[in-house]
């Protein structure tokens, strides 16, 4: 990958240009940030009896540990993990949209929404989550953090639907 001004060109290992459409880096970073927001909301808020520990571990590659721990503590206090383990409750989060995005000094301040669906037996409940955070660019790590963003600050607010 070669960055020329605001364009990105793709070359193979022999240095030959590959037939790819050049893309505006701002648009590329916006798409990568949207993917990062989606992954962050998913791994922080989606779990069942088999996936809760793995999803928590994955989330720590996407968002700061203190902010992730605060969200995990809320679920623990609300007995969500207990319900998943003992009653088979399933929590699934789906990204909706970016509400606002601004960039200053290499930091991306973003507000976005997602919907958490909680399935507990025959009961289903939906909660809209409004997330706000400041993300920075980092080196991508496969498979933990493929977007190359990391939330330095992050918080969530919940609205019952």
Name every feature range the model reports, one short phrase each.
Residues 36-47:
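Solvent-exposed, amphipathic alpha-helical segments
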């Amino acid at each position: 990958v070669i960055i020329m001004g605001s364009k990105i060109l793709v070359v193979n290992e022999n240095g030959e240009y590959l037939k790819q459409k050049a893309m505006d880096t701002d648009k590329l970073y916006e798409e990568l940030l949207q993917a990062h927001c989606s992954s962050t909301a998913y791994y922080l808020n989606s779990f069942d009896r088999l996936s809760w520990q793995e999803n928590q571990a994955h989330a720590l590659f996407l968002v700061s540990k203190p902010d992730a721990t605060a969200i995990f503590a809320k679920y623990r206090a609300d007995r969500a993990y207990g319900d998943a383990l003992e009653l088979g409750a399933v929590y699934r989060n789906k990204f909706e949209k970016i509400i606002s995005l601004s960039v200053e000094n290499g930091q991306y301040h973003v507000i976005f929404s997602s919907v958490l669906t909680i399935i507990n037996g025959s009961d289903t409940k939906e909660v809209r989550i409004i997330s706000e955070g400041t993300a920075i660019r980092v080196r991508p790590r496969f498979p933990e953090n493929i977007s190359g963003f990391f939330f330095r600050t992050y918080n969530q607010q919940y609205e019952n639907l």
